């Protein structure tokens, strides 16, 4: 059956007519019905080869910010995977995803070390009465730590050179973490031990939930920079108002509102900074900015803890 199909398909068109004309026979021979076209003939056509299908729009592979300059000026990754065109991605796209996963792993490793150091300092200042009494009796160390924190933060946030070059980036981040841990530990020393532990648990649950939600949701928090800026300015001026009113009169409900606002704002900033690591949002961080990524998320978590401490904490007697 296959041989017969191939013999009919391979027969040149018009061969029978030429044989009849050569023998002088016209319209005497019965017409032979044409065989159905073969698979090769049916799938072949103009502009298409046999066995191929028409190509859709070419998918653009992802590019890291250090290998691609975005004309619009936004850094990082753009757009994610276009739906329905995964087969068009080149090997570079998958390599790029490996770079992004390595970047996220590096950021959270650094963040884990920062949080463990801070937790150790907070535990020392909370449970050790000798250390607690010393830091409360010497507030000068607090202001010195605040100055170191502010200087290292400005250096890491504003200067890309020290932030990207090893080992200066790790040295600055270590100094920054130790100073911030001292500030957090001293603040915790004024609160009851049970309150500190409760706020630690609440902070851990909130941060874990926000992180999982930020990785799973399709909502792009990185496109809400304007809203976050307005909320941050509201928080800033509310803090100034409290600083002015505090020497004259302490208003508990106003302080509670400020703590709720602060915890909410930095929870949103935690979602924003988490999605900056992912690379498939409107804005994202370069894989070289692992120090900056860890710095932002660490600050968000510390600020959430301190605002929860102001909201739920009980002062020591």
Swiss-Prot record:
Pfam families according to UniProt: Bax1-I
Gene Ontology biological-process entries: apoptotic signaling pathway; cerebellar granular layer development; cerebellar Purkinje cell differentiation; cerebellar Purkinje cell layer development; cerebellum development; negative regulation of apoptotic signaling pathway; negative regulation of extrinsic apoptotic signaling pathway via death domain receptors; negative regulation of neuron apoptotic process
Annotated glycan sites: 192
Keyword Lipid biosynthesis appears in the UniProt entry: no
GO cellular component labels: endoplasmic reticulum; Golgi apparatus; Golgi membrane; membrane; membrane raft; postsynaptic membrane
Disulfide bonding pattern of the chain: none
Keywords, comma-separated and alphabetical: Apoptosis, Cell membrane, Glycoprotein, Membrane, Postsynaptic cell membrane, Synapse, Transmembrane, Transmembrane helix
Subcellular location(s) per record: Cell membrane; Membrane raft; Postsynaptic cell membrane
Tissue expr: Brain. Highly expressed in cerebellum, also found in cortex, olfactory bulb, and hippocampus.
UniProt entry tagged with the keyword ATP-binding: no
Function, as annotated: Antiapoptotic protein which protects cells uniquely from Fas-induced apoptosis. Regulates Fas-mediated apoptosis in neurons by interfering with caspase-8 activation. Plays a role in cerebellar development by affecting cerebellar size, internal granular layer (IGL) thickness, and Purkinje cell (PC) development.
Similarity field: Belongs to the BI1 family. LFG subfamily.
Assembly and interaction partners: Interacts with FAS/TNFRSF6 and BAX.
Stored PANTHER family: BAX INHIBITOR-RELATED (PTHR23291), PROTEIN LIFEGUARD 2 (PTHR23291:SF18)
Protein name: Protein lifeguard 2
Source species of the chain: Mus musculus (Mouse)
Lineage, highest ranks first: Eukaryota, Metazoa, Chordata, Craniata, Vertebrata
């Amino acid at each position: 059956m296959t041989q017969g199909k191939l013999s009919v398909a391979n027969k040149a068109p018009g061969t029978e007519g030429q044989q009849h004309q050569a023998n002088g026979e016209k319209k005497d021979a019965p017409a032979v019905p044409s065989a159905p076209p073969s698979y090769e003939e049916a799938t072949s056509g103009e502009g298409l080869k046999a066995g191929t299908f028409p190509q859709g729009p070419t998918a653009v592979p992802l590019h890291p910010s250090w290998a691609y300059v975005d004309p619009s000026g936004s850094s990082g990754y753009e757009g994610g995977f276009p739906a329905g065109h995964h087969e068009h991605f080149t090997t570079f796209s998958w390599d790029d995803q490996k770079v992004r996963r390595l970047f996220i792993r590096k950021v959270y490793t650094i963040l884990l070390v920062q949080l463990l150091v801070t937790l150790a300092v907070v535990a020392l200042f909370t449970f050790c009465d000798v250390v607690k009494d010393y830091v409360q009796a010497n507030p000068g160390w607090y202001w010195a730590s605040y100055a170191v924190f502010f200087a290292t933060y400005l250096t890491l946030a504003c200067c890309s050179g020290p932030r990207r070059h090893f080992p200066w980036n790790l040295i600055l981040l270590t100094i920054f973490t130790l100073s911030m841990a001292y500030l957090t530990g001293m603040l915790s020393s004024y609160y009851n031990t049970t309150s500190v532990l409760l706020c630690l648990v609440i902070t851990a649950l909130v941060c874990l939930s926000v992180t999982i939600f930020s990785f799973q949701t399709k909502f792009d928090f990185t496109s809400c920079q304007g809203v976050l800026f307005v909320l941050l300015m509201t928080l800033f001026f509310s803090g100034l108002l409290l600083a002015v009113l505090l020497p004259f009169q302490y208003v508990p409900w106003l302080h509670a509102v400020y703590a709720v606002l602060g915890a909410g704002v930095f929870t949103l900033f935690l979602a924003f900074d988490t999605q900056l690591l992912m690379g498939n949002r409107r804005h994202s961080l370069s894989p070289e900015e692992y120090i900056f990524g860890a710095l932002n998320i660490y600050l968000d978590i510390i600020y959430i803890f301190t605002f929860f401490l102001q909201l739920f904490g009980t002062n020591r007697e």
